[in-house]
Amino acid sequence: GGKDPGGISLSKYNEKDFTLSTVLKIKKLLEMEPMIKVVLTRSDDSYPTLQERAKVANDLKADLFVSIHANSIPAGSKSSPSGTETYYTRQESLEFAKTVHKYLIPATGLSDRGVRQSSLYVTRETKMPAILLECGYLSSANDEAWLYSEDFQQRVAEAVVSGIKEYLGL
């Protein structure tokens, strides 16, 4: 957010707009759950650093951390991937990643690119189960057409909430 637009889609949409819109939908759904307290690291067009995001979660001793994204590859690349991926770093996050991912795939209707381990800052430096969701590819015409639709974002939000609730046993 803020000065960092994130990835830029084929039609010149900013990743930050997809992510904020989707995250606000997730927040609205989670706030209906009496056992869940939601804290966002970004609720407007601001730019908290990765370090600040991890610090917020760690300082609050959050139970879970979810980072929402849309993937992209550089223009002119030989491949043009499409689909949804879920990333985690530490083994303690694997079950959470699998649980959310199983809801995300049917919700998006995009290719299943799997649950993958990667040392990403926010999933590595947070002290609770943490995942990063790549909900589609900005660099794919098919994915981009979905990413900016309200219906798609709502389905993603509902899938993430279903995964969180199942993981927490709610």
Regions found by a protein language model. Give the residues of each.
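Active-site-adjacent mobile loop/cap segments within catalytic or ligand-binding domains
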Residues: 67, 74-75, 85-87, 114-170
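Solvent-exposed loop/turn segments at secondary-structure junctions
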Residues: 1-4, 43-48, 70-76, 91-94, ...
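A short, gly/pro- and small-residue-rich
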Residues: 79-95
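Short, electropositive alpha-helical surface patch
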Residues: 48-64, 121-132
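Active-site histidine-acidic residue metal-binding/catalytic motifs
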Residues: 1-54, 60-62, 74-75, 81-82
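Sec/Tat-exported extracytoplasmic proteins
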Residues: 26-30, 34, 42, 61, ...
